[in-house]
């Protein structure tokens, strides 16, 4: 049984907690996270105060993609946070740019996730 299918589990709170953990692990600033999600920093803070982020919302879908990128990086680098952060902030010739900068646009975020999935062999 999925954790989200259990009674009493709030999917909005679970997504927000996973997103904030992802931000911390990847060493993203609040401004960088807000840029990826397409919201301003104040809106991001309000979501934290409200206790959740709807998975079905546009922001929620972008958050799920970012979490997917984190999980792919974790698998590729064996959980080495320094290497994961280096990947995001370094020029990548296959992606023709810096992944973190590309992730500020939806198509860039999708491209980075697809690239990570491809090199993992998924």
Language model: regions and residue ranges:
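Non-transmembrane "mature" sequence context
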Residues: 1-122
């Amino acid at each position: 049984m999925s954790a989200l299918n259990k009674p009493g589990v709030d999917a909005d709170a679970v997504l927000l907690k996973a997103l904030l953990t992802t931000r911390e692990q990847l060493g993203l600033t609040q401004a960088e996270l807000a840029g990826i999600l397409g919201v301003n920093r104040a809106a991001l803070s309000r979501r934290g105060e409200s206790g959740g982020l709807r998975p079905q919302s546009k922001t929620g879908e972008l958050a799920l993609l970012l979490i997917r990128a984190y999980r792919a990086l974790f698998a590729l680098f064996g959980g080495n946070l320094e290497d994961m952060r280096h990947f995001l902030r370094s020029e990548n010739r296959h992606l023709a740019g810096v992944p973190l900068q590309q992730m500020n646009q939806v198509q860039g975020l999708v491209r980075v996730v697809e690239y990570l999935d491809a090199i993992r062999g998924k």
